[in-house]
Amino acid sequence: MPQTGPLSALTDDQTGREGRPANRTVAAVENAPQHPTPHTPVITAPAPASASATTATPGTTTGINATTTVTKELAHRTTDTDVFPTRWSRISDTRFRFTAHWSAAHPFFGPVDDRHQDPMVVGETLRQASMVLAHAEFDAPADTHFVMWDLTVSTDPSALLLSDAAEPVEIDVVCSEIRRRGRGLASMRTTMEFRRAGRFVARGTGSTGCTSPLAYRRLRGRQLAEVGTPVPLLPGIAPELAGRSRAEDVVLAPADRPGVWLLRVDTGHPVLFPRPNDHVPGMVLFEAARQSAAAASGQRPFLPRTMTADFARYAELHSPCLLETELLDEDPEEVTVRVSGRQDGEAVFTATLTSARTAEVRSPS
C-alpha cells in the first residue's frame, strides 16, 4: 500500500530501488500541454507576481526558502482559475512547502452541500503540485507526459468547510522513491499534508512516472492519431444520484444492471478535458470512482474520508468502460465502496472509498 503516515516518517534521501511500485503496469497519464510545435514545446512563465516571488520554468531549481509562483503551464492547466497551488518554497532537496487556495466558487471542485467543500480538490491539488515539482525542481522537460500509478487521500471532512474557503491551505511535501533517468526524472512519490488555519485537513500520496514524447508516441501512436475524433456523449444519470449539482459534471451513464454504470466521457468539459487527449485522464477516473460510490451507497453527500486508487492501464476514449461497485461492509457509522473500472475485458483501475453515513438517495439502477 502507498505510504500515508506522518511526513516526519520519510527521510530526505529515501529513494526506491526500482523507481516503480510493485505490480504496476501502465496508468492514467497527464498529457504535456499542447503547443503549436508539438515536438519542441516551450513553457513560458508570466512576470513575477511580486518582488518577493519568482517564477520557475522546467529544468530550473529554486533556492532554499525562495518563494516561487506556480503558473498554469507548470500545473498543466489552461486557465488560472483551475490552478490550486499558488506558490512554493524549497526546504531541502526533497522537502517543499506549498500554499494553495480552494475557491468556494470553482465550477467543478465547488461545494458538495451547503457546508462542505469537495474533498476531491485534495487529490487534484496533489496531482498539480507533483507536476510542478517534477518540472521546476527535478528537471522534467516541458513536454513530459506524467503517468499516475496510484493515489491515496485521507481527509477530515469537518475541516473542509465553505466558511473557511478564503483561508490559504498550507501543504508540506516530501518527495521520495526518486528515480533518475540521466539528468532528468524517471519517477517519484510525493507525500503531502494539508492544513488550513493550523488545522489538519488532509493527507495524500501518489507515485508518478515520466514519459518522454518519443517514448509516448511509440506507446500510443495509434491513439494519438485519433485525437480529435468525436466521442459519443452518453446520457448521464441524474446529478443528485452521482452527488453532483450540474448535469454537465456527471461522468456516469446507466448500464444494464444494478450497481454498474458506464463511464460518460465529455471531451468538451472545460475542467476534465482542458485540451485534446488520447485517453481518459486519471482525474476523470478518480471522479468516476467517487460518483459511483455515491450512486451505489445512496449517500448524499458522499464525503470520502479515505480514497485509494490503483491504475492498471489506459482508459480508452472509444470503447465502453464499465464501472462495477461493491459495498464492502454494513458499518452503522460509515460506508465503504469498492469501484472497479473494466474495458474490453481488462481491468483499468480499482478504487476504494469510505464515507460517513448520511441521508440516503435511492438509485433506480
Task: Tell me what each language-model feature is.
Residues 247-322, 338-340:
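Acidic/His-leaning functional-site neighborhoods
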Residues 5, 283, 361:
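Basic, ligand-binding patches in group-transfer machinery
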Residues 98-104, 142-152:
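A short glycine/small-residue-enriched secondary-structure motif
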Residues 1-114, 209-272, 364-365:
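Non-catalytic linker/capping segments at the edges of enzyme domains
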Residues 151-197, 305-347:
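Hydrophobic beta-sheet segments that form the core/acyl-binding groove
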Residues 117-145, 280-302:
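Active-site helix/loop of acyl-thioester processing domains in fatty-acid/polyketide metabolism
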Residues 145-148, 154-163, 206, 218-221:
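A cross-family "folded-core" feature that marks the main globular domain of proteins
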Residues 180-226, 336-365:
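Mixed-charge, glycine-accented linear interaction segment located at domain edges/termini
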